Amino acid sequence: MRKVWRILLIFIAVIALGYVGLNIFVSQKIKSLLSEEVGNGNIAYANYHFNWLSASFKLDSVTFIADENVISASSIKVNKLNYSDYVFDGVLSVDAIQINYPEVSLWKTTAKKQDSLPKNNGNENQMIKIGQIKLKQGNLSYSIDSTEVLTLQKYDVQFDDVVIDVENKSNKIPFSYQTIEVNGGKLNYILSSLQTLTLDSLMIDEKAIDIHQLQIKPNYSKANYVKVLAHEMDLMDISFHRVNFSDYRFDTQEKIGFSASLLSMDSIQADIHRNKLVADDLTKKKMYSQMLRDLPFDLSIDTLKLSQVDLTYEEVQEKTGETGSIFFKEMEVEAHHISNHPAGNDDFAETKFDIKTQFMGKSPLSVQWRFHVNNPDDSFRITGAGHNISPQQLNSFFVPAFNMKAEGDPIQDLYFDFYGNKYTANGNFKMVYDNVKIKVLKNDNKKSVNKLVTFVANLFVKSENKARENDVEVEKVERDPTKSFWNYFWNCIMEGLKKTVI
Protein backbone atom coordinates (compact mmCIF):
# COMPACT_ATOMS: atom_id res chain seq x y z
CA MET A 1 0.00 0.00 0.00
CA ARG A 2 2.87 2.34 0.87
CA LYS A 3 4.36 1.63 -2.53
CA VAL A 4 1.14 2.67 -4.24
CA TRP A 5 1.01 5.90 -2.29
CA ARG A 6 4.64 6.54 -2.98
CA ILE A 7 4.11 6.05 -6.72
CA LEU A 8 1.04 8.28 -6.59
CA LEU A 9 2.90 11.02 -4.74
CA ILE A 10 5.80 10.78 -7.16
CA PHE A 11 3.35 11.01 -10.08
CA ILE A 12 1.67 14.06 -8.56
CA ALA A 13 5.04 15.64 -7.87
CA VAL A 14 6.16 15.02 -11.44
CA ILE A 15 2.92 16.54 -12.77
CA ALA A 16 3.26 19.53 -10.45
CA LEU A 17 6.90 20.05 -11.33
CA GLY A 18 6.05 19.67 -15.00
CA TYR A 19 3.24 22.23 -14.70
CA VAL A 20 5.48 24.66 -12.85
CA GLY A 21 8.26 24.02 -15.33
CA LEU A 22 5.89 24.63 -18.22
CA ASN A 23 4.78 27.88 -16.61
CA ILE A 24 8.39 28.92 -16.12
CA PHE A 25 9.06 28.18 -19.80
CA VAL A 26 5.94 30.11 -20.88
CA SER A 27 6.83 32.98 -18.56
CA GLN A 28 10.30 33.24 -20.03
CA LYS A 29 8.89 32.95 -23.56
CA ILE A 30 6.43 35.81 -22.92
CA LYS A 31 9.18 37.90 -21.36
CA SER A 32 11.42 37.21 -24.35
CA LEU A 33 8.68 38.26 -26.79
CA LEU A 34 8.02 41.41 -24.75
CA SER A 35 11.74 42.25 -24.74
CA GLU A 36 11.82 41.84 -28.52
CA GLU A 37 8.86 44.22 -28.93
CA VAL A 38 10.46 46.68 -26.50
CA GLY A 39 13.59 46.59 -28.63
CA ASN A 40 11.52 47.27 -31.75
CA GLY A 41 9.88 50.26 -30.07
CA ASN A 42 6.40 48.70 -30.24
CA ILE A 43 5.78 48.34 -26.50
CA ALA A 44 6.94 49.70 -23.16
CA TYR A 45 6.03 48.59 -19.63
CA ALA A 46 7.22 49.05 -16.05
CA ASN A 47 6.72 45.64 -14.42
CA TYR A 48 6.00 42.06 -15.49
CA HIS A 49 4.53 39.55 -13.02
CA PHE A 50 3.83 35.86 -13.79
CA ASN A 51 1.89 33.62 -11.40
CA TRP A 52 3.23 30.10 -11.87
CA LEU A 53 0.33 28.48 -10.02
CA SER A 54 -2.53 30.08 -11.98
CA ALA A 55 -0.72 30.51 -15.32
CA SER A 56 -1.60 34.22 -15.27
CA PHE A 57 0.47 37.32 -15.82
CA LYS A 58 0.23 41.07 -15.36
CA LEU A 59 1.88 44.10 -16.95
CA ASP A 60 2.03 47.51 -15.27
CA SER A 61 2.19 50.92 -16.98
CA VAL A 62 1.89 49.48 -20.48
CA THR A 63 2.16 51.41 -23.75
CA PHE A 64 1.64 49.94 -27.23
CA ILE A 65 2.81 51.93 -30.25
CA ALA A 66 1.94 51.25 -33.91
CA ASP A 67 2.81 54.09 -36.27
CA GLU A 68 1.02 57.14 -34.80
CA ASN A 69 -1.44 54.99 -32.84
CA VAL A 70 -0.81 54.74 -29.10
CA ILE A 71 -2.60 52.55 -26.56
CA SER A 72 -1.63 52.80 -22.90
CA ALA A 73 -3.03 51.28 -19.70
CA SER A 74 -2.21 51.41 -16.02
CA SER A 75 -2.24 47.59 -16.00
CA ILE A 76 -3.17 44.57 -18.11
CA LYS A 77 -3.94 41.26 -16.44
CA VAL A 78 -4.24 37.97 -18.37
CA ASN A 79 -5.90 35.25 -16.29
CA LYS A 80 -5.20 31.55 -16.86
CA LEU A 81 -3.51 30.48 -20.04
CA ASN A 82 -5.20 27.25 -21.16
CA TYR A 83 -2.43 25.00 -22.46
CA SER A 84 -4.68 22.03 -23.22
CA ASP A 85 -6.67 24.02 -25.81
CA TYR A 86 -3.46 24.82 -27.64
CA VAL A 87 -2.04 21.27 -27.42
CA PHE A 88 -5.20 19.45 -28.53
CA ASP A 89 -7.04 22.07 -30.65
CA GLY A 90 -4.31 24.46 -31.76
CA VAL A 91 -6.23 27.38 -30.21
CA LEU A 92 -4.69 30.08 -28.02
CA SER A 93 -7.10 30.36 -25.11
CA VAL A 94 -7.28 32.41 -21.91
CA ASP A 95 -10.01 32.78 -19.31
CA ALA A 96 -10.01 36.56 -19.05
CA ILE A 97 -8.16 39.77 -19.89
CA GLN A 98 -8.66 42.92 -17.83
CA ILE A 99 -7.31 46.28 -18.99
CA ASN A 100 -7.43 49.08 -16.44
CA TYR A 101 -7.61 52.77 -17.40
CA PRO A 102 -6.86 52.30 -21.10
CA GLU A 103 -6.02 55.44 -23.08
CA VAL A 104 -6.50 54.80 -26.81
CA SER A 105 -5.25 57.39 -29.31
CA LEU A 106 -5.84 56.44 -32.94
CA TRP A 107 -4.56 58.51 -35.83
CA LYS A 108 -5.28 58.47 -39.54
CA THR A 109 -3.47 60.56 -42.10
CA THR A 110 -4.88 61.31 -45.55
CA ALA A 111 -1.39 61.63 -47.04
CA LYS A 112 -0.10 58.54 -48.84
CA LYS A 113 2.78 56.75 -47.22
CA GLN A 114 4.51 53.41 -47.36
CA ASP A 115 2.87 50.69 -45.31
CA SER A 116 4.96 50.22 -42.20
CA LEU A 117 3.05 47.29 -40.77
CA PRO A 118 5.13 44.18 -40.05
CA LYS A 119 4.97 41.33 -42.50
CA ASN A 120 2.85 38.32 -41.66
CA ASN A 121 5.05 35.93 -39.71
CA GLY A 122 2.61 33.05 -39.90
CA ASN A 123 1.16 33.51 -36.40
CA GLU A 124 -1.41 36.17 -37.31
CA ASN A 125 -3.90 33.56 -38.54
CA GLN A 126 -3.91 31.87 -35.13
CA MET A 127 -7.40 31.46 -33.66
CA ILE A 128 -7.70 33.07 -30.23
CA LYS A 129 -10.43 32.45 -27.67
CA ILE A 130 -10.93 34.71 -24.65
CA GLY A 131 -13.58 33.95 -22.06
CA GLN A 132 -13.95 37.58 -21.07
CA ILE A 133 -12.39 40.95 -21.93
CA LYS A 134 -12.87 43.90 -19.57
CA LEU A 135 -11.84 47.49 -20.20
CA LYS A 136 -12.32 49.68 -17.13
CA GLN A 137 -12.48 53.48 -17.09
CA GLY A 138 -11.11 53.98 -20.59
CA ASN A 139 -10.73 57.02 -22.81
CA LEU A 140 -10.66 56.95 -26.61
CA SER A 141 -9.69 59.54 -29.21
CA TYR A 142 -9.55 59.30 -33.00
CA SER A 143 -7.91 61.94 -35.19
CA ILE A 144 -7.68 62.50 -38.93
CA ASP A 145 -4.54 64.48 -39.75
CA SER A 146 -4.46 67.20 -37.08
CA THR A 147 -8.20 67.16 -36.31
CA GLU A 148 -9.60 65.17 -33.40
CA VAL A 149 -12.90 63.84 -34.78
CA LEU A 150 -13.98 61.41 -32.05
CA THR A 151 -13.60 61.23 -28.27
CA LEU A 152 -15.21 58.86 -25.77
CA GLN A 153 -14.61 59.40 -22.07
CA LYS A 154 -14.84 57.20 -18.99
CA TYR A 155 -16.20 54.03 -20.56
CA ASP A 156 -16.37 50.46 -19.24
CA VAL A 157 -16.65 47.60 -21.74
CA GLN A 158 -17.07 43.86 -21.23
CA PHE A 159 -17.07 41.20 -23.97
CA ASP A 160 -17.89 37.56 -23.18
CA ASP A 161 -16.84 34.48 -25.17
CA VAL A 162 -14.64 36.31 -27.64
CA VAL A 163 -13.26 34.57 -30.73
CA ILE A 164 -10.66 36.14 -33.03
CA ASP A 165 -10.45 34.14 -36.25
CA VAL A 166 -8.74 35.79 -39.22
CA GLU A 167 -8.95 32.65 -41.37
CA ASN A 168 -12.77 32.48 -41.32
CA LYS A 169 -13.57 34.23 -44.60
CA SER A 170 -17.33 34.19 -43.92
CA ASN A 171 -16.87 36.89 -41.28
CA LYS A 172 -16.56 40.46 -42.51
CA ILE A 173 -14.99 41.28 -39.14
CA PRO A 174 -12.68 38.58 -37.69
CA PHE A 175 -13.94 39.30 -34.17
CA SER A 176 -17.03 37.79 -32.58
CA TYR A 177 -18.54 37.64 -29.11
CA GLN A 178 -21.61 36.27 -27.38
CA THR A 179 -22.53 39.23 -25.17
CA ILE A 180 -21.38 42.81 -24.67
CA GLU A 181 -21.88 45.39 -21.95
CA VAL A 182 -20.88 49.04 -22.32
CA ASN A 183 -21.25 51.81 -19.79
CA GLY A 184 -19.84 54.89 -21.46
CA GLY A 185 -19.53 58.53 -20.59
CA LYS A 186 -19.49 61.52 -22.90
CA LEU A 187 -18.98 61.04 -26.63
CA ASN A 188 -18.07 63.77 -29.12
CA TYR A 189 -17.97 63.09 -32.88
CA ILE A 190 -17.47 65.60 -35.71
CA LEU A 191 -19.98 64.53 -38.39
CA SER A 192 -18.86 67.14 -40.91
CA SER A 193 -17.45 70.64 -41.12
CA LEU A 194 -20.96 71.86 -40.22
CA GLN A 195 -22.19 69.44 -37.55
CA THR A 196 -20.98 67.74 -34.36
CA LEU A 197 -22.68 64.85 -32.56
CA THR A 198 -22.49 64.56 -28.77
CA LEU A 199 -24.05 62.32 -26.14
CA ASP A 200 -23.89 62.26 -22.36
CA SER A 201 -24.05 58.51 -21.76
CA LEU A 202 -24.09 55.24 -23.68
CA MET A 203 -25.19 51.94 -22.13
CA ILE A 204 -25.21 48.63 -23.99
CA ASP A 205 -26.13 45.17 -22.76
CA GLU A 206 -27.25 42.00 -24.50
CA LYS A 207 -30.84 43.26 -24.81
CA ALA A 208 -30.70 47.01 -25.39
CA ILE A 209 -28.69 50.06 -26.45
CA ASP A 210 -29.59 53.11 -24.37
CA ILE A 211 -28.37 56.64 -25.21
CA HIS A 212 -29.05 59.78 -23.18
CA GLN A 213 -28.87 63.42 -24.28
CA LEU A 214 -27.91 62.84 -27.91
CA GLN A 215 -27.37 66.12 -29.77
CA ILE A 216 -26.47 67.12 -33.32
CA LYS A 217 -25.18 70.68 -32.99
CA PRO A 218 -24.07 73.23 -35.61
CA ASN A 219 -20.41 74.27 -35.68
CA TYR A 220 -21.35 77.72 -37.03
CA SER A 221 -24.03 80.30 -36.38
CA LYS A 222 -26.81 80.77 -38.95
CA ALA A 223 -25.11 83.95 -40.15
CA ASN A 224 -21.67 82.38 -40.56
CA TYR A 225 -22.34 78.88 -41.87
CA VAL A 226 -23.24 80.15 -45.35
CA LYS A 227 -19.70 81.51 -45.68
CA VAL A 228 -18.25 77.98 -45.81
CA LEU A 229 -20.87 76.43 -48.12
CA ALA A 230 -20.34 75.72 -51.81
CA HIS A 231 -24.07 75.02 -52.25
CA GLU A 232 -27.33 74.81 -50.28
CA MET A 233 -27.28 72.57 -47.23
CA ASP A 234 -29.41 72.25 -44.11
CA LEU A 235 -27.98 73.44 -40.81
CA MET A 236 -29.44 71.19 -38.12
CA ASP A 237 -29.74 71.66 -34.38
CA ILE A 238 -31.37 68.50 -32.99
CA SER A 239 -31.51 67.09 -29.48
CA PHE A 240 -32.87 63.75 -28.24
CA HIS A 241 -33.46 63.22 -24.53
CA ARG A 242 -33.24 59.46 -24.98
CA VAL A 243 -32.64 56.96 -27.80
CA ASN A 244 -33.22 53.25 -27.15
CA PHE A 245 -32.76 50.14 -29.32
CA SER A 246 -34.56 47.06 -27.96
CA ASP A 247 -33.74 43.45 -28.88
CA TYR A 248 -30.94 44.51 -31.18
CA ARG A 249 -28.49 42.34 -33.08
CA PHE A 250 -25.21 42.94 -34.92
CA ASP A 251 -24.32 40.53 -37.71
CA THR A 252 -20.85 40.13 -39.23
CA GLN A 253 -21.59 37.03 -41.31
CA GLU A 254 -21.07 37.58 -45.07
CA LYS A 255 -22.53 41.11 -44.89
CA ILE A 256 -22.54 43.48 -41.94
CA GLY A 257 -26.05 43.99 -40.57
CA PHE A 258 -28.01 45.55 -37.73
CA SER A 259 -31.53 44.82 -36.55
CA ALA A 260 -33.78 45.81 -33.65
CA SER A 261 -37.37 45.09 -32.74
CA LEU A 262 -37.92 48.66 -31.53
CA LEU A 263 -36.16 52.00 -31.90
CA SER A 264 -37.67 54.65 -29.64
CA MET A 265 -36.69 58.33 -29.42
CA ASP A 266 -38.14 60.64 -26.78
CA SER A 267 -38.37 64.42 -26.29
CA ILE A 268 -36.90 65.64 -29.57
CA GLN A 269 -36.23 69.28 -30.40
CA ALA A 270 -35.32 69.76 -34.07
CA ASP A 271 -34.48 73.09 -35.72
CA ILE A 272 -33.59 72.97 -39.42
CA HIS A 273 -32.31 76.07 -41.21
CA ARG A 274 -31.70 76.50 -44.95
CA ASN A 275 -30.37 79.59 -46.73
CA LYS A 276 -31.47 79.83 -50.37
CA LEU A 277 -29.09 82.73 -51.04
CA VAL A 278 -26.43 80.04 -51.47
CA ALA A 279 -26.07 78.35 -54.86
CA ASP A 280 -28.41 75.41 -55.54
CA ASP A 281 -27.17 71.89 -54.95
CA LEU A 282 -27.84 70.29 -58.34
CA THR A 283 -26.81 66.75 -57.40
CA LYS A 284 -29.56 64.16 -57.81
CA LYS A 285 -31.39 63.33 -54.57
CA LYS A 286 -32.56 59.84 -53.74
CA MET A 287 -36.05 58.91 -52.61
CA TYR A 288 -36.13 57.43 -49.10
CA SER A 289 -36.80 53.94 -50.45
CA GLN A 290 -33.63 54.11 -52.56
CA MET A 291 -31.63 55.45 -49.60
CA LEU A 292 -32.56 52.30 -47.68
CA ARG A 293 -31.85 50.03 -50.66
CA ASP A 294 -28.41 51.55 -51.16
CA LEU A 295 -27.19 51.23 -47.57
CA PRO A 296 -23.85 49.35 -47.46
CA PHE A 297 -25.19 47.10 -44.70
CA ASP A 298 -28.39 45.19 -43.92
CA LEU A 299 -30.82 47.14 -41.75
CA SER A 300 -34.04 45.95 -40.15
CA ILE A 301 -36.03 48.00 -37.60
CA ASP A 302 -39.40 46.41 -36.87
CA THR A 303 -40.91 49.47 -35.18
CA LEU A 304 -39.80 53.10 -34.85
CA LYS A 305 -41.44 55.41 -32.31
CA LEU A 306 -40.79 59.14 -31.95
CA SER A 307 -42.56 60.95 -29.13
CA GLN A 308 -42.82 64.57 -27.98
CA VAL A 309 -41.21 66.02 -31.10
CA ASP A 310 -41.04 69.76 -31.76
CA LEU A 311 -39.87 70.53 -35.30
CA THR A 312 -39.12 73.94 -36.82
CA TYR A 313 -38.07 74.58 -40.42
CA GLU A 314 -36.65 77.97 -41.47
CA GLU A 315 -35.77 79.07 -44.98
CA VAL A 316 -34.01 82.29 -46.00
CA GLN A 317 -35.60 83.35 -49.28
CA GLU A 318 -33.49 83.96 -52.37
CA LYS A 319 -35.44 86.97 -53.65
CA THR A 320 -36.06 88.89 -50.43
CA GLY A 321 -33.42 87.59 -48.01
CA GLU A 322 -36.20 87.24 -45.44
CA THR A 323 -36.72 84.13 -43.33
CA GLY A 324 -39.90 82.09 -43.57
CA SER A 325 -40.71 79.44 -41.00
CA ILE A 326 -43.18 76.71 -40.17
CA PHE A 327 -43.25 74.52 -37.10
CA PHE A 328 -44.90 71.40 -35.72
CA LYS A 329 -45.55 70.75 -32.02
CA GLU A 330 -46.24 67.59 -30.01
CA MET A 331 -45.44 65.33 -32.95
CA GLU A 332 -45.85 61.57 -32.48
CA VAL A 333 -44.50 59.18 -35.12
CA GLU A 334 -44.87 55.42 -35.39
CA ALA A 335 -43.27 53.54 -38.28
CA HIS A 336 -43.05 49.87 -39.18
CA HIS A 337 -40.65 47.77 -41.22
CA ILE A 338 -37.75 50.10 -41.88
CA SER A 339 -35.66 47.54 -43.67
CA ASN A 340 -33.63 46.78 -46.78
CA HIS A 341 -33.37 43.05 -46.12
CA PRO A 342 -34.16 40.86 -47.97
CA ALA A 343 -34.35 43.30 -50.90
CA GLY A 344 -35.96 41.91 -54.04
CA ASN A 345 -38.44 39.64 -52.25
CA ASP A 346 -41.92 39.81 -53.79
CA ASP A 347 -43.44 39.68 -50.30
CA PHE A 348 -41.25 42.50 -49.02
CA ALA A 349 -43.25 44.28 -46.35
CA GLU A 350 -44.43 47.85 -46.95
CA THR A 351 -42.72 50.58 -44.93
CA LYS A 352 -45.36 52.58 -43.06
CA PHE A 353 -45.24 55.92 -41.21
CA ASP A 354 -48.13 57.27 -39.14
CA ILE A 355 -47.69 60.86 -37.94
CA LYS A 356 -49.81 63.02 -35.64
CA THR A 357 -48.90 66.60 -34.76
CA GLN A 358 -50.10 70.16 -34.14
CA PHE A 359 -49.36 72.27 -37.23
CA MET A 360 -48.07 75.69 -36.13
CA GLY A 361 -48.79 74.55 -32.57
CA LYS A 362 -52.59 74.83 -32.96
CA SER A 363 -54.04 72.80 -35.83
CA PRO A 364 -54.37 68.98 -35.65
CA LEU A 365 -52.61 67.28 -38.55
CA SER A 366 -52.31 63.55 -39.29
CA VAL A 367 -50.26 61.96 -42.08
CA GLN A 368 -49.94 58.39 -43.35
CA TRP A 369 -46.96 57.66 -45.60
CA ARG A 370 -46.23 54.35 -47.33
CA PHE A 371 -43.54 53.09 -49.70
CA HIS A 372 -41.92 49.87 -50.92
CA VAL A 373 -38.16 49.69 -50.45
CA ASN A 374 -37.70 47.00 -53.10
CA ASN A 375 -39.56 48.93 -55.84
CA PRO A 376 -36.98 50.40 -58.27
CA ASP A 377 -39.50 53.10 -59.32
CA ASP A 378 -39.74 54.19 -55.65
CA SER A 379 -43.53 54.16 -55.56
CA PHE A 380 -45.20 55.84 -52.57
CA ARG A 381 -48.51 57.03 -51.20
CA ILE A 382 -48.97 59.85 -48.69
CA THR A 383 -52.35 60.85 -47.26
CA GLY A 384 -53.37 63.22 -44.52
CA ALA A 385 -55.88 65.53 -42.91
CA GLY A 386 -55.59 68.91 -41.19
CA HIS A 387 -58.25 70.81 -39.27
CA ASN A 388 -58.96 74.35 -38.06
CA ILE A 389 -56.05 75.98 -39.87
CA SER A 390 -56.04 79.76 -39.54
CA PRO A 391 -54.85 81.55 -42.71
CA GLN A 392 -52.78 83.81 -40.47
CA GLN A 393 -50.77 80.76 -39.35
CA LEU A 394 -49.50 80.39 -42.90
CA ASN A 395 -48.18 83.93 -43.15
CA SER A 396 -44.91 83.24 -41.32
CA PHE A 397 -43.95 81.31 -44.46
CA PHE A 398 -46.22 82.80 -47.14
CA VAL A 399 -45.13 86.41 -46.64
CA PRO A 400 -41.35 85.85 -47.04
CA ALA A 401 -41.67 83.05 -49.61
CA PHE A 402 -44.49 84.27 -51.87
CA ASN A 403 -44.92 87.95 -50.93
CA MET A 404 -48.57 87.19 -50.15
CA LYS A 405 -50.66 87.38 -46.99
CA ALA A 406 -53.66 85.14 -46.27
CA GLU A 407 -56.63 86.44 -44.29
CA GLY A 408 -60.11 85.27 -43.40
CA ASP A 409 -61.82 82.51 -41.45
CA PRO A 410 -60.05 79.28 -40.50
CA ILE A 411 -59.81 76.49 -43.04
CA GLN A 412 -62.17 73.97 -41.46
CA ASP A 413 -60.75 70.82 -43.05
CA LEU A 414 -57.95 69.97 -45.44
CA TYR A 415 -57.45 66.52 -46.98
CA PHE A 416 -54.86 65.16 -49.38
CA ASP A 417 -54.10 61.81 -50.98
CA PHE A 418 -51.08 61.70 -53.29
CA TYR A 419 -49.48 58.68 -54.93
CA GLY A 420 -46.65 58.36 -57.39
CA ASN A 421 -43.05 57.37 -57.94
CA LYS A 422 -39.70 59.06 -58.40
CA TYR A 423 -40.90 60.69 -61.63
CA THR A 424 -44.48 61.98 -61.25
CA ALA A 425 -47.30 62.12 -58.71
CA ASN A 426 -51.09 62.33 -58.90
CA GLY A 427 -53.85 62.45 -56.35
CA ASN A 428 -56.72 64.33 -54.75
CA PHE A 429 -56.93 67.45 -52.62
CA LYS A 430 -59.87 68.90 -50.69
CA MET A 431 -60.11 72.08 -48.63
CA VAL A 432 -63.23 73.11 -46.72
CA TYR A 433 -63.35 76.88 -46.14
CA ASP A 434 -65.84 79.77 -46.08
CA ASN A 435 -63.90 82.98 -46.45
CA VAL A 436 -60.25 83.17 -47.45
CA LYS A 437 -58.68 86.34 -48.88
CA ILE A 438 -55.26 86.75 -50.47
CA LYS A 439 -53.35 90.05 -50.22
CA VAL A 440 -50.43 90.54 -52.58
CA LEU A 441 -47.72 92.65 -50.96
CA LYS A 442 -45.48 95.26 -52.49
CA ASN A 443 -41.76 94.63 -52.76
CA ASP A 444 -40.85 97.21 -50.15
CA ASN A 445 -39.52 97.10 -46.63
CA LYS A 446 -42.90 98.00 -45.16
CA LYS A 447 -44.65 95.06 -46.85
CA SER A 448 -47.61 97.30 -47.70
CA VAL A 449 -50.52 95.87 -49.66
CA ASN A 450 -50.58 96.12 -53.44
CA LYS A 451 -54.29 96.92 -53.66
CA LEU A 452 -54.72 96.55 -57.42
CA VAL A 453 -53.04 93.15 -57.67
CA THR A 454 -54.84 92.02 -54.50
CA PHE A 455 -58.22 93.00 -56.01
CA VAL A 456 -57.48 91.09 -59.21
CA ALA A 457 -56.22 88.05 -57.29
CA ASN A 458 -59.31 87.86 -55.11
CA LEU A 459 -61.58 87.97 -58.17
CA PHE A 460 -60.23 84.48 -58.87
CA VAL A 461 -60.47 83.14 -55.31
CA LYS A 462 -63.50 80.88 -54.96
CA SER A 463 -65.61 82.37 -52.21
CA GLU A 464 -68.29 79.69 -52.27
CA ASN A 465 -67.60 76.53 -50.30
CA LYS A 466 -67.70 73.83 -52.97
CA ALA A 467 -64.78 71.85 -51.63
CA ARG A 468 -67.05 69.93 -49.28
CA GLU A 469 -68.74 68.39 -52.31
CA ASN A 470 -65.95 67.95 -54.85
CA ASP A 471 -62.38 66.77 -54.66
CA VAL A 472 -59.76 68.53 -56.73
CA GLU A 473 -57.65 66.26 -58.89
CA VAL A 474 -53.91 66.84 -58.80
CA GLU A 475 -52.31 65.46 -61.95
CA LYS A 476 -48.80 64.83 -63.21
CA VAL A 477 -46.77 66.80 -60.69
CA GLU A 478 -43.22 66.29 -61.92
CA ARG A 479 -40.46 65.69 -59.43
CA ASP A 480 -37.28 67.73 -59.66
CA PRO A 481 -34.60 65.05 -59.06
CA THR A 482 -32.27 67.70 -57.61
CA LYS A 483 -34.76 68.37 -54.79
CA SER A 484 -35.79 66.30 -51.78
CA PHE A 485 -38.92 64.18 -51.38
CA TRP A 486 -40.40 66.88 -49.13
CA ASN A 487 -40.04 69.47 -51.89
CA TYR A 488 -41.88 67.01 -54.17
CA PHE A 489 -44.65 66.62 -51.57
CA TRP A 490 -44.87 70.41 -51.07
CA ASN A 491 -45.33 70.91 -54.82
CA CYS A 492 -48.28 68.48 -54.72
CA ILE A 493 -49.83 70.50 -51.87
CA MET A 494 -49.32 73.79 -53.74
CA GLU A 495 -50.88 72.35 -56.90
CA GLY A 496 -53.91 71.31 -54.86
CA LEU A 497 -54.17 74.75 -53.23
CA LYS A 498 -54.05 76.52 -56.58
CA LYS A 499 -56.79 74.32 -58.05
CA THR A 500 -58.94 74.71 -54.94
CA VAL A 501 -58.95 78.47 -54.39
CA ILE A 502 -58.31 79.81 -57.92
What are the functions of these language-model segments?
Residues 1-42, 145-150, 154-156:
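N-terminal type II signal-anchor transmembrane helix
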Residues 2-8, 370-372, 378, 385, ...:
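Extended terminal
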Residues 9-11, 15, 123, 226, ...:
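Mature-chain termini and adjacent capping regions
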Residues 39-40, 61, 114-118, 179, ...:
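Flexible, solvent-exposed coil segments and beta strand-coil junctions
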Residues 40-41, 68-80, 147-162, 190-199, ...:
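Amphipathic hydrophobic-ligand
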Residues 44-111, 119-155, 160-215, 227-275, ...:
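Flexible beta-edge/linker motif
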Residues 110-117, 278-284, 401-402, 444-450:
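Flexible, surface-exposed loop regions and adjacent strand-edge segments
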Residues 121-139, 250, 285-430, 491, ...:
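Solvent-exposed beta-strand/coil patches in large extracellular/periplasmic or lumenal scaffold regions
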